[in-house]
A protein has these predicted regions:
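Alpha-helical protein-protein interaction elements
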Residues: 7-8, 18, 34, 66, ...
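Short, charged/polar N-terminal "headpieces" of proteins
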Residues: 1-25
């Protein structure tokens, strides 16, 4: 599973799975197991704003901190995403 960075953000690894790259760009935030069933999931918009689909085990301050981190780094993160996917940013049309 590709990681966006080699370090943790608010004590969580930011990653995506190669089988989920058919969806719009998003970020899973999880522990070392990187199990997406229990990880948080943020969809990323073209301006860096995020939509929290699932909070996982994140506390509210971790959610807002990770959202801010994504906002500040989304262009770099999107470049990493594009290494694996040709899907774009979240536009509000995701089937759950």
């Amino acid at each position: 599973m590709p990681k966006y960075y080699g370090f943790k953000v608010f004590d969580h690894i930011l990653y995506f799975t190669t089988h989920c790259t058919v969806e719009a760009m998003h970020v899973h935030a999880g522990n070392e197991e990187m199990n997406e069933r229990i990880a948080a999931k943020f969809f990323v918009k073209a301006n860096g704003d995020t939509v929290l689909q699932k909070a996982g085990d994140l506390k509210p301050h971790q959610v807002s901190g990770i959202q801010q981190f994504i906002k500040e780094n989304y262009r770099e993160m999107y470049a990493r995403w594009q290494e694996y996917s040709d899907t774009g940013f979240y536009t509000g049309r995701v089937s759950i």
